[in-house]
Amino acid sequence: MTRVKVCGITNRSDLDTAVDAGVDAVGLIVDVDVQTPREISPQQAAELAAATPPFVTAVLVTMADVPDAATELVEAVRPDAVQVHGESTPDALASLGAAVEADVIKATDPGTAATYDGHADAVLVDSLDESGAGGTGTVHDWDRTGELVESLQSPVVLAGGLTPENVADAVEAAAPFAVDVASGVEAESGQKDADAVSAFVDAAGGCQ
């Protein structure tokens, strides 16, 4: 069964919406070098992480420098996992993983995903901008991601331009460990739509 992460949770209402829809993970965006309505403060993220119920993974999503700044942020927010965007070496990721009690996910593009295989608990394959940030809302080559699923040891999370309308095709093409969505389930920028979240979860799971 492909797991589902809804990223860019900014408030308790949207957290409840995602949990009620049956998501497996929620993303809390803190300390990123891009303008996004989904970014929240470390304190807000810590409150939402603490409110996330058992069996739902709270994921800190950040561009903080690895390992030092990212380690401090993980200690402040106390998530179940940390998803790292931007430039970082495999050794830096390993240092982060050794320093925190959280799984480490590396966001990357299809061309560089293999670099981080085995150095992170999972790799998230996204359509990244020049800064290494995701959230572009752009679809990439799902067949290429499927090849990574077959060749990498690390679990592969598929992100980039996913919606309730196309996620079933994406899962069929790539068979990822999980799919990740943000803008594709929003009624307006930064605000989740309950119907869209439920439809996304149903579509991602219905094609198994």
UniProtKB/Swiss-Prot annotation:
What is the primary gene name for this protein?
A: trpF
- Reactions catalysed according to its record: N-(5-phospho-beta-D-ribosyl)anthranilate = 1-(2-carboxyphenylamino)-1-deoxy-D-ribulose 5-phosphate
Q: Its Enzyme Commission number? A: 5.3.1.24
Which EC main class describes this enzyme? isomerase
Extract the PANTHER family matched here.
N-(5'-PHOSPHORIBOSYL)ANTHRANILATE ISOMERASE
The molecule here is called N-(5'-phosphoribosyl)anthranilate isomerase
List, alphabetically, the Gene3D superfamilies matched: Aldolase class I
**Family note:** Belongs to the TrpF family.
> For this chain's UniProt record, which GO biological process terms are given?
L-tryptophan biosynthetic process
Q: Which UniProt keywords apply?
A: Amino-acid biosynthesis, Aromatic amino acid biosynthesis, Isomerase, Tryptophan biosynthesis
SUPFAM superfamilies per UniProt: Ribulose-phoshate binding barrel
Q: Which organism is it from?
A: Natronomonas pharaonis (strain ATCC 35678 / DSM 2160 / CIP 103997 / JCM 8858 / NBRC 14720 / NCIMB 2260 / Gabara) (Halobacterium pharaonis)
Can you name one GO molecular function term for this protein?
Answer: phosphoribosylanthranilate isomerase activity
UniProt KW Transport keyword: no
**Pathway where it operates:** Amino-acid biosynthesis; L-tryptophan biosynthesis; L-tryptophan from chorismate: step 3/5
